[in-house]
Amino acid sequence: MTEQFDVVVIGAGPAGLSAALNLVRARRKVLVLDSNRPRNAATFASHGFVTRDGISPLELRRLGREELEAYEGATFAKAVVSAIEPGFVVTAGASYQASAVVIATGLTEKFPALPSLRTFYGTSIHSCVECDAYEYADAPIALIGETDDLAERALLISQWSRDLIVFTNAVGRITADEETRLAERGVSVDRRAVADVAGDRDGLSGIVLADGDVIPRSAAFVRPMYSTNLGYAASLGLATTAEGWLEIDDSGRTSVPGVYAAGDSTAPGPQQLIVAAGAGARVASAVNRDLLA
């Protein structure tokens, strides 16, 4: 027999947990389904979350789940969602019937193919500038990426350190005008191919170029390519932006009535944890009101 819920929340990051907490406090019967594979699992400390500055993302998730499960009406299950059928039958091993669905599954990062990058990711190599740049104020920093928005990201990083070199890996695009503007901030551009990153147990020490040069750097930001994890929702025909993010209105409603989204799978993509949590709370309010209609 298919178990019935008011709302099924898919994903237990800050967006999903915040949505679920606010919904269960609205006396909704809520099921949270999560694969327990957060993309920021390698990160030791997250920042900018008021009252939780410096907490690890995994600990933040643990505390959020603990708070949620203290409420009657909340159910948490470790499971991978394989399908959402019309009528909101959610399949994740078992099948669950919902009156509304909140998608908060985040995204997947694809990094430049550097053999040692993962060794330092989460310690001295990061992807979120606002989350981690403060710890490297005035330090020699690298920005590594293969996208067309490197100049914009470099300008942002230069607020924390102007000892910054942008490595395009012979792929990323920076125009002459952008390079001039970066130079005005003391930022240089290296267009050579990158072979790897170097370091030891103390952290990153340099960027290894394909021609053999090693450029000393003590920290780096990497610009990943992002993809949403939405194959399970394909049958719903949800509208997406040109970049692949779910289209939502100001309250988190998708193009399909009864389906909502919050967090990194929505435009403009990955943001700070506290922003995702706020989006989850906003969506919860919309879901609760819509279920009364």
Predicted region positions:
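FAD-binding core/adjacent interface of flavoenzyme oxidoreductases
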Residues: 1-8, 75-139, 220, 246-254, ...
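Beta1-alpha1 glycine-rich phosphate/pyrophosphate-binding loop at the start
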Residues: 5-62, 139-140, 149-172
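Residue-level detector of alpha-helix initiation sites
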Residues: 13-14, 109, 148-149, 266-267
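Internal hydrophobic alpha-helix adjacent to the cofactor/substrate pocket in enzyme cavities
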Residues: 24-28, 162-168, 276-293
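A Rossmann-like FAD-binding core segment of flavoenzymes
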Residues: 62, 68-91, 95-98, 161-245, ...
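FAD-site-proximal beta/loop scaffold in flavoenzymes
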Residues: 113, 119-135, 224-276, 282, ...
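Active-site glycine-rich loop that binds ribose-phosphate moieties when present
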Residues: 123-130, 142-153, 175-176
